[in-house]
Design a protein with these regions (language model features):
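Active-site glycine-rich loops that stabilize anionic/oxyanionic intermediates
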Residues: 89-94, 252
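Alpha/beta-hydrolase active-site loop
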Residues: 132-188
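Short beta-strand element of the alpha/beta-hydrolase
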Residues: 81-90
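Primarily recognizes the serine-hydrolase "nucleophile elbow" in alpha/beta-hydrolase
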Residues: 171-243
Length: 313
């Protein structure tokens, strides 16, 4: 699915924030933040619902993002490896899940010398009543959610195929991700980044945005590698000629999510392309970086995305 969205005017210069506006900034990171576009994001100028942020138990849920923004977390220059990731939060394209787990992951990436560009991409616009329903806490005795059976074709694990509103939001989110890749590469020298080692990490629907960005195939706006944390493709996949290496992580019982990522892995292997898949027997939505991070960073070294760790004498 190629985004039917014309590129907007990117925010050409990011603003250095020195006043501690993000209290949870990883220690030692330099932080920049700015709107992704100058003026309104192209295509969604008519959106009017206000942004709503809800916090609970260290998690942050942000609804009605209509003006995407980026925040950049850089490791110290002396530790920078040249690798960078655009981080795409999850939330079913309806909300962005941020907070403690996101901060933990960014700190871990910075600790490995990897720059992180956190993108808050556009999401479905919800009324106040819809947000109240979506953000209501689950009863303590509620059974775990059951996932409807979904036939996976061409690795497409979209649970709501044909939903026009979600299809539109996915196009907008992909356009935002493309613009973020362009922005990141344009600042490569300043941020000590190799423009040929800029990948994406997407959680849940964020993984779908990453795969959509890959499939759009825009020059200068495709990821050099993709890390997906229980985030399958949300559209039919054809393996591109310049297919990036994949690192896929999921729970073993996450229904169509697991099935979709298994299908993606099989497609890459059928083409003798680098891909690694880990399916953990853990509760759904419990995939913290402490579970998969060590193996991921070893894989990044094996793929020459990161420098190898010097051997101990």
């Amino acid at each position: 699915m190629t985004p039917a969205v014309k590129p907007g005017r990117p925010a050409l210069a990011l603003v250095l924030l020195t006043l501690g506006l993000f209290a949870s900034t990883p220690a030692g990171a330099q932080q920049y933040a700015a709107p992704l576009y100058r003026g309104s994001a192209p295509g969604s100028e008519s959106w009017t619902f206000p942004v709503v942020t809800r916090e609970r138990n260290g998690g942050v849920s942000r609804y009605n993002t209509r003006e995407p923004k980026v925040a950049v977390y850089l490791p110290p220059a002396s530790k920078a490896t040249g690798a960078a990731v655009v981080m795409l939060p999850g939330g079913g394209l309806r909300v962005l899940g941020l907070g403690a787990e996101t901060d933990e992951a960014m700190a871990r990436f910075n600790g490995e010398g990897i720059a992180v560009v956190l993108l808050e991409y556009r999401t479905l616009q919800l009324s106040p009543e819809e947000i109240d329903r979506a953000s209501a806490p689950r009863p303590a005795n509620a059974p775990p959610p059951r996932f409807a059976k979904l036939e996976i074709h061409n690795a497409n694990a979209n649970p709501a195929p044909g939903d026009r509103r979600l299809d539109e939001v996915l196009r907008f989110a992909v356009a935002d991700a493309q613009e973020t890749l362009r922005l990141t590469r344009s600042h490569a020298a300043e941020w000590h980044i190799d423009p040929h080692r800029v990948g994406m990490i997407g959680t849940s629907a964020g993984g779908g945005v990453a795969f959509g960005t890959m499939l759009a195939g825009q020059p200068g706006a495709t990821p050099d590698f993709i890390i997906s944390i229980f985030g399958p493709a949300l559209q039919d996949v054809t393996v591109p000629s310049n297919a990036p290496p994949l690192f896929l992580v999921t729970e073993s019982n996450h229904g169509p999510v697991t099935d979709g990522l298994v299908a993606l892995f099989a497609m890459w292997k059928d083409h003798d392309l680098p891909a690694e898949l880990h399916a953990y027997e853990v509760p759904n939505f419990s995939m913290r970086v402490s579970l998969w991070g060590s193996r991921l960073f070893d894989w990044m070294r094996e793929q020459k995305i990161l420098r190898p760790v010097p051997a101990k004498k």
